[in-house]
């Protein structure tokens, strides 16, 4: 993979188009690593089963969540590219690392929904109150909030895909729902792509705690 160079009128035109779907920011967004040839789908191991039951309130947070993932690509996009970009998140994540596990969960739940067209962009949104539980000594501090925003791009000679990611999380008193999803769903595959770190609960074999 290499950064494209504006050597032809066609590429100049493409750059002008792409510029419209990027935030105005002087800092160059990070690039995803080289795309592998093998893109076989596989189901994640059992530890990726999300929380199904909570018996205690230790290290538990009830959070009002807003998630948005905007996909920009002049020629359309495939989930193969999106999955590969998400595999690089640990290396290029710029937000609060005590809440990176929450960000992964929210991004994947967001991308599991139906996108809405917005110009050349496809926008996935999630607004929900959810319950999260972390393993001991992990997760956000009491009362800590999250405002995370980052742009990540895939750019080579033939294709440009940009992701604009926004996730906010605020602790609230509204009763949330436990985050859960079908094991065969797209979100569960994305969790494994992003190496979501969990730990099986000692109390309940079907419950998992976030480790990040």
Swiss-Prot record:
Listed InterPro entries: Rhabdo_M, Rhabdovirus_M_sf
Membrane topology qualifier: Peripheral membrane protein
Domain of life the protein comes from: Viruses
Pfam families in the record: Rhabdo_M2
Cellular component GO terms held in the UniProt record: host cell endomembrane system; membrane; viral envelope; virion membrane
Region Essential for glycoprotein binding: start-end pairs: 125-161
GO biological-process terms attached to the record: viral budding via host ESCRT complex
Statement: the UniProt record of this protein carries the keyword Membrane: yes
Oligomeric and partner information: Homomultimer. Interacts with nucleoprotein and with the cytoplasmic domain of glycoprotein.
Misc. remarks from the entry: Most abundant protein in the virion.
Domain notes: Late-budding domains (L domains) are short sequence motifs essential for viral particle budding. They recruit proteins of the host ESCRT machinery (Endosomal Sorting Complex Required for Transport) or ESCRT-associated proteins. Matrix protein contains one L domain: a PPXY motif which potentially interacts with the WW domain 3 of NEDD4 E3 ubiquitin ligase (Potential).
Protein task: Plays a major role in assembly and budding of virion. Completely covers the ribonucleoprotein coil and keep it in condensed bullet-shaped form. Inhibits viral transcription and stimulates replication. Plays a major role in early induction of TRAIL-mediated apoptosis in infected neurons.
Name of the featured protein: Matrix protein
Gene source species: Australian bat lyssavirus (isolate Bat/AUS/1996) (ABLV)
């Amino acid at each position: 993979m290499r950064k494209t160079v504006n050597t032809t009128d066609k590429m100049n035109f493409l750059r002008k188009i792409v510029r419209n779907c990027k935030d105005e920011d002087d800092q160059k967004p990070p690039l995803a690593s080289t795309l592998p040839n093998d893109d076989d789908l596989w189901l994640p191991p059992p530890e990726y089963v999300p929380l199904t039951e909570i018996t205690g309130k230790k290290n538990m947070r009830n959070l009002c969540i807003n998630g948005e993932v905007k996909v920009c690509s002049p020629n359309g996009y495939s989930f193969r590219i999106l999955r590969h970009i998400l595999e690089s998140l640990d290396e290029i994540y710029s937000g609060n690392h005590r809440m990176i596990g929450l960000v992964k969960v929210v991004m994947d739940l967001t991308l599991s929904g139906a996108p809405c067209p917005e110009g050349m962009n496809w926008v996935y949104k999630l607004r929900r109150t959810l319950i999260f539980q972390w393993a001991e000594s992990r997760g956000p501090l009491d009362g800590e909030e999250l405002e995370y925003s980052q742009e990540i791009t895939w750019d080579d000679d033939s294709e440009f895909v940009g992701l604009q990611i926004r996730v906010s999380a605020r602790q609230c008193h509204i009763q949330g729902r436990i985050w859960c999803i079908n094991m065969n769903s797209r979100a569960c595959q994305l969790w494994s792509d992003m190496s979501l770190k969990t730990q099986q609960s000692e109390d309940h074999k079907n419950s998992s705690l976030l480790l990040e």
